[in-house]
Amino acid sequence: MALKALLGLSQAQLETWAKDQGLPPFRGRQLHDWLYAKGARHWHDITVLPAALRQQEPLPLGRSNELERHLAQDGTLKLLLATDDGLSLETVGIPTRDRLTVCVSSQVGCPMACRFCATGKEGLQRSLEPHEIVDQVLTVREVMQRRPSHVVFMGMGEPLLNSDHVLTAIDCLSRDLGMAMRQITVSTVGVPNTLPRLAELALERLGRAQFTLAVSLHAPDQALREELIPTARAYPYEQLLEDCRHYVAISGRRVSFEYILLGNLNDSPRQAQALAEQVRGFQSHVNLIPYNPIAEEEFQRPEPARVDAFAAALKQRGVAVSVRASRGLDQNAACGQLRRQRQGGR
């Protein structure tokens, strides 16, 4: 099988590759340094390799081409990147004073069709390869000239429909880029028969399941959840929560829950009370996300007072809660707004 990309290979794998080329193992270590520390983009740029090797047919490093970049007023960066097969994807860099979070995509498009999310409006093209996920982190690092501290799989796609490649990418981010696995979050809207298996696969392949799992609920009951998330019809609320309990038992890590707040639809104090009942016993954290508008839907962003009241109702019932600040709204880079659309940026 032809090598798809060098990016994503470990130092040991690159040393083996060097041996196969008749080179000493230290060439593999040098290549590892150029791929991950220096962020090499082109084969010919790796000047430590022998000239004769560099002049041969270039090997695929696995780096994307930047199509557009958009910088929001709050400093959030949105990049439109091109894949080798002519598709495109979006990734986002979210800076604060003491951290840089990269919001990565796991698929080109998304099949889940959540009504409040722009990505699902275009359907699924394909799942991303591990190197295409790692490349997003390297590209944001390169453009923003800052080392990413956190990675969240909250961009385009449903990570649990690409769990094999997602876990491979997480392994690379931890092993080769030195990221703490606890600073990596995998977000899912829920796919039947995948949550316990994700924990088992992480233990088998990574030796631990230390990344954070964030499960998107978005409603306090099955009926409303089905209205917002069509695929929820195949995944009863009770079964989703039971699978979350199994995940916790296997991984030893708590689950966090995400809840998008839609004005006058799922943001009442009564619904907050119902949500608190659903997550009772999880010792979990609920992350509230005020809706970020998209063109195709008429959902409303909730008034700040309703957001505060919803959060207060959860806290009164012993639920740890936070409200996510919307970042990159003026460039359609906020949660739920990614869609592979060219806007004429740099």
From Swiss-Prot:
Primary residence: cytoplasm
UniProt superkingdom: Bacteria
Co-factor binding comment: Binds 1 [4Fe-4S] cluster. The cluster is coordinated with 3 cysteines and an exchangeable S-adenosyl-L-methionine.
EC number: 2.1.1.192
A GO cellular component entry from the record: cytoplasm
InterPro entries linked to this entry: Aldolase_TIM (IPR013785), Methyltransferase_A (IPR040072), RlmN_N (IPR048641), RNA_MTrfase_RlmN (IPR027492), rRNA_lsu_MTrfase_RlmN/Cfr (IPR004383), rSAM (IPR007197)
Active site, per annotation: 90 (proton acceptor), 335 (s-methylcysteine intermediate)
Binding site for [4Fe-4S] cluster: 110, 114, 117
Reactions listed under catalytic activity: adenosine(2503) in 23S rRNA + 2 reduced [2Fe-2S]-[ferredoxin] + 2 S-adenosyl-L-methionine = 2-methyladenosine(2503) in 23S rRNA + 5'-deoxyadenosine + L-methionine + 2 oxidized [2Fe-2S]-[ferredoxin] + S-adenosyl-L-homocysteine; adenosine(37) in tRNA + 2 reduced [2Fe-2S]-[ferredoxin] + 2 S-adenosyl-L-methionine = 2-methyladenosine(37) in tRNA + 5'-deoxyadenosine + L-methionine + 2 oxidized [2Fe-2S]-[ferredoxin] + S-adenosyl-L-homocysteine
Key word Methyltransferase present: yes
Binding site for S-adenosyl-L-methionine: 157-158, 187, 216-218, 292
CDD domains on file: Radical_SAM
Subcellular location: Cytoplasm
Signal peptide from the UniProt entry: none
SUPFAM superfamilies: Radical SAM enzymes
GO molecular function per UniProt: 4 iron, 4 sulfur cluster binding; metal ion binding; rRNA (adenine(2503)-C2-)-methyltransferase activity; rRNA binding; tRNA (adenine(37)-C2)-methyltransferase activity; tRNA binding
Family annotation (PANTHER family): 23S RRNA METHYLTRANSFERASE (PTHR30544), RADICAL SAM CORE DOMAIN-CONTAINING PROTEIN (PTHR30544:SF5)
Family: Belongs to the radical SAM superfamily. RlmN family.
UniProt miscellaneous comment: Reaction proceeds by a ping-pong mechanism involving intermediate methylation of a conserved cysteine residue.
Its job: Specifically methylates position 2 of adenine 2503 in 23S rRNA and position 2 of adenine 37 in tRNAs.
HAMAP family found in the cross-reference section: RNA_methyltr_RlmN
Protein's name according to its UniProt entry: Probable dual-specificity RNA methyltransferase RlmN
